[in-house]
Amino acid sequence: MTNIRKSHPLFKIINDSFIDLPAPSSISSWWNFGSLLGVCLAVQILTGLFLAMHYTSDTATAFYSVTHICRDVNYGWVLRYLHANGASMFFICLFLHVGRGIYYGSYTFSETWNIGIILLFAVMATAFMGYVLPWGQMSFWGATVITNLLSAIPYVGTTLVEWVWGGFSVDKATLTRFFALHFLLPFIISAMVMVHLLFLHETGSNNPTGIPSDADMIPFHPYYTIKDILGLVLMLMALLSLVLFAPDLLGDPDNYTPANPLNTPPHIKPEWYFLFAYAILRSIPNKLGGVVALVLSILVLAVIPLLHTSKQRSMTFRPLSQCLFWLLVADLLTLTWIGGQPVEHPFIIIGQLASILYFLIILVLMPLASIAENHLLKW
């Protein structure tokens, strides 16, 4: 009799994805982030579900329902801060996961990569809408500023903004629909994650060398299950340390003030994980130009596979490309810092230079470095 995990239609899918899956023997800890993202998503859905049981999406009571969760609900403060800081952990893992994909040339799996980009957009949209729900000052003004960007679209812009708002300003209708969409999107993301995995398992995983590893595969379980559990324990330790010792470290103090349409905060800024894109948006004086640059800052990832000019897949043995990659990382950190600064000298010019450098590295310098490395290999 065959093992039930290999014969049962449902268990067979799980078995082929997480147990008997052939995996390259050389994949490093940079390959842990896929499973960590899965755990982050599960944590967010669970904590979010329990928060939704106590939250009310009405402008009059939203802020106070969150206060009620923190003060009166059993371990409500843990739920709230796990959810808020879980989002930060989600984005840390996302950025590292995408960075790994760029460094090791995983973007040559085009279907997996493109679904990953759509997933990134979906997670960013979900996080933005979630930030609006507590209905603090930064929630309200963040929603106003970001949704207002749609008005830059020629001809239909203003109509589109009012359609998104459900009125002539960010109000009750906006909050209600953002709550509905914020609740719905994670389940759509879960379905897309399955498609992401489906396409990944069509090709098998990449590895640090970038060389096909068909001749040297090992079963996923127990080798990578135990490795993933180690990564999971480390991530949960970091998340719990953040939640229990410094829950407001990554938040904005302005969000502890109830939303007031008559009082604008001195510095409107999004959560830290959007600051790099926000800095690119602000670096262009023209509204439409800024919106285009904002979208392109993420959409540029879709162009990376088309600009792969190297004869090697991974950057492991390509020192020039490695230098440019780490320059890109430093540039993104600079943009993140600038996004949180006021719009004044010298931050304006630093932001503009960092924005230009961001697109220059990805679109021009990396492909040129790859061509140079190809020529160096001939010697």
From Swiss-Prot:
One of its GO terms (biological process) is mitochondrial electron transport, ubiquinol to cytochrome c. The chain crosses the membrane at residues 33-53, 77-98, 113-133, 178-198, 226-246, 288-308, 320-340, 347-367. GO terms for molecular function: metal ion binding; ubiquinol-cytochrome-c reductase activity. Heme b b562 binds at H83, H182. It is found in: Mitochondrion inner membrane. The cytochrome bc1 complex contains 11 subunits: 3 respiratory subunits (MT-CYB, CYC1 and UQCRFS1), 2 core proteins (UQCRC1 and UQCRC2) and 6 low-molecular weight proteins (UQCRH/QCR6, UQCRB/QCR7, UQCRQ/QCR8, UQCR10/QCR9, UQCR11/QCR10 and a cleavage product of UQCRFS1). This cytochrome bc1 complex then forms a dimer. CDD domains: cytochrome_b_C, Cytochrome_b_N. It comes from the Eukaryota. Keywords: Electron transport, Heme, Iron, Membrane, Metal-binding, Mitochondrion, Mitochondrion inner membrane, Respiratory chain, Transmembrane, Transmembrane helix, Transport, Ubiquinone. SUPFAM superfamilies: a domain/subunit of cytochrome bc1 complex (Ubiquinol-cytochrome c reductase), Transmembrane di-heme cytochromes. The keyword Mitochondrion applies. This is Cytochrome b. PROSITE patterns: CYTB_CTER (PS51003), CYTB_NTER (PS51002). Component of the ubiquinol-cytochrome c reductase complex (complex III or cytochrome b-c1 complex) that is part of the mitochondrial respiratory chain. The b-c1 complex mediates electron transfer from ubiquinol to cytochrome c. Contributes to the generation of a proton gradient across the mitochondrial membrane that is then used for ATP synthesis. Binds 2 heme b groups non-covalently. The keyword rRNA processing does not apply. Belongs to the cytochrome b family. A ubiquinone binds at H201. It is a multi-pass membrane protein. Its cofactor is heme b. Heme 1 (or BL or b562) is low-potential and absorbs at about 562 nm, and heme 2 (or BH or b566) is high-potential and absorbs at about 566 nm.
